[in-house]
Amino acid sequence: MIKKRIIPCLDVKDGRVVKGIQFKGLRDIGNPVDLAMYYNEAGADELVFLDISKTEEGHSLMLEVIEQTASRLFIPLTVGGGIQSLDDITQLLNHGADKVSLNSSALKNPQLIKQASDKFGRQCICIAIDSYYDPERKAHYCCTTGGKKMTNIKVYDWVQQVEQLGAGELLVTSMGHDGMKQGFDIEHLANIKSLVNIPIIASGGGGNAQHFVELFDQTDVSAGLAASILHDRETTVQSIKEVIRQGGIAVR
C-alpha cells in the first residue's frame, strides 16, 4: 500500500509567508526558510512553496528563498506561482526545486505541460487547479490568477487533458473550502480521482486531523495539503499523522 503524505503549503509573497481565507485577506506568518526548516524537522513529507508575489523583485526574492531552503531540506520541494516558460522551470529546478507546479500558464498554453514533461520528466510536473463550483452552471471550473478569474474550462475535462499531456501529479484546491477548516471537498476529489491515474494532492479545508482521516478513508488521493492549521500551530504534522494511523491508514 502506498503511504499517504502530509504536505505543508507556504504561500510566499515578496519573501514572506502569508495566509488568507478563500484566497483573500492575507496576513504575515513568517520567514519561509525558517518555516521550511521547522516543517522539515516536524515530519512533513514534502513542502509546497507558492510564489504569489506581484513584482519581479518578489519573484527574484523567491529564487533566493528556494536556494537557501533547498540546501538544508531533506524532503522534496515543489514550487509554483508565476511560472510562464521552460526557462522559468529550468531556473527553479537549478535553484533546488524538485518539482514545479503550473496553473494559469498551463491553462493559457496547455502545450507547456507536454514540453515541460518531455524536457524535465513527468515526475517534475505538477498541475495546480483552483477549482470553483459555479452554482448557476452547476459545474466546477478552473480559475486563474490566484483564484481571481474563472475560466470556461471545466475541471473534470481539464484533469484528463493534463494527464494526457504529461502531468505527473495534480494539486487540487477546492476554493470554496480554502482556509475554512471545515473539511475537504470529498465528493469532488473522489470524482477527479475516478478520472485520472496520476497522484492527487488535496488542498482546501483541512481543519483538524480527523478531516485528513476522512480524506484518505473516502478518497484515493495520495496526499493532503495543510496550511492554516499548521501555521497557526493549532496542531502539528506528527499529531495529524498519529490520528491517521489510529484510523488504520498507512502514512509516511
From Swiss-Prot:
Its main location: cytoplasm. One of its GO terms (molecular function) is imidazoleglycerol-phosphate synthase activity. InterPro entries: Aldolase_TIM (IPR013785), His_biosynth (IPR006062), HisF (IPR004651), IGPS_HisA/HisF (IPR050064), RibuloseP-bd_barrel (IPR011060). Pathway: Amino-acid biosynthesis; L-histidine biosynthesis; L-histidine from 5-phospho-alpha-D-ribose 1-diphosphate: step 5/9. The keyword Protein biosynthesis does not apply. Its EC number is 4.3.2.10. The active site is at D11, D130. One of its GO terms (biological process) is L-histidine biosynthetic process. Transmembrane segments: none annotated. It is an enzyme of class 4 (lyase). It catalyses: 5-[(5-phospho-1-deoxy-D-ribulos-1-ylimino)methylamino]-1-(5-phospho-beta-D-ribosyl)imidazole-4-carboxamide + L-glutamine = D-erythro-1-(imidazol-4-yl)glycerol 3-phosphate + 5-amino-1-(5-phospho-beta-D-ribosyl)imidazole-4-carboxamide + L-glutamate + H(+). Keywords: Amino-acid biosynthesis, Cytoplasm, Histidine biosynthesis, Lyase. It is found in: Cytoplasm. GO terms for cellular component: cytoplasm. Belongs to the HisA/HisF family. IGPS catalyzes the conversion of PRFAR and glutamine to IGP, AICAR and glutamate. The HisF subunit catalyzes the cyclization activity that produces IGP and AICAR from PRFAR using the ammonia provided by the HisH subunit. PANTHER family: IMIDAZOLE GLYCEROL PHOSPHATE SYNTHASE HISHF (PTHR21235:SF2), IMIDAZOLE GLYCEROL PHOSPHATE SYNTHASE SUBUNIT HISF/H IGP SYNTHASE SUBUNIT HISF/H (PTHR21235). Heterodimer of HisH and HisF. This is Imidazole glycerol phosphate synthase subunit HisF. It comes from Staphylococcus aureus (strain Newman). The lineage of its organism: Bacteria, Bacillati, Bacillota, Bacilli, Bacillales.
